[in-house]
C-alpha cells in the first residue's frame, strides 16, 4: 500500500506567448494557467519522521484554532483572529516544522469558515481526526526555498527528497506551492 505522504503535487503557473490575442485585451498582464503535477516521493526514514510530525502539527493546530474560535465566539459573540504565531509559545513543538505549512492551516480554516457563511449547507468546519484525515500539508515558494533538480526536490526543513519524475513540467512553468 502507498502512503499518502509519498505523493507530492506541484501547482505551477504557466504564461502564454505574446502571439496570443487574448493577452492584448489586458495590456501588461499575462494570461496565467494553473497546472498541477503529481510525483511520488521517496523520503528517508528521518524525512518520514519529520513528515509525520508536520502532518500531526498541522492537524493539531487546525483543531486548536477551530476550538479557540468556537470558545471565543461562545463567550464574546465575536470572531477570534488567531494566527499560528500565537500558539508557538505555548506549544514549542510547532517550531520544529515548516512555518509556511502552519500558515496554510490558518488559510484553510479561514476558507472553511467563508464557505460555511457563504452557504450553510456546506456545514460548519469540522475537527480533523488522526485516523480519518488525509496526511498532507501545503507549503509555498518563498525566496526560492523549494527547488527541483533532476529527480530531487528540496523542501523546507526536509532538505532534498528523491522523487519519481515521470514527466517534465512545461518550460515556462513557475513553481507556486507544493502539497
Annotate each language-model stretch with its function.
Residues 1-179:
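Nucleic-acid substrate recognition interfaces
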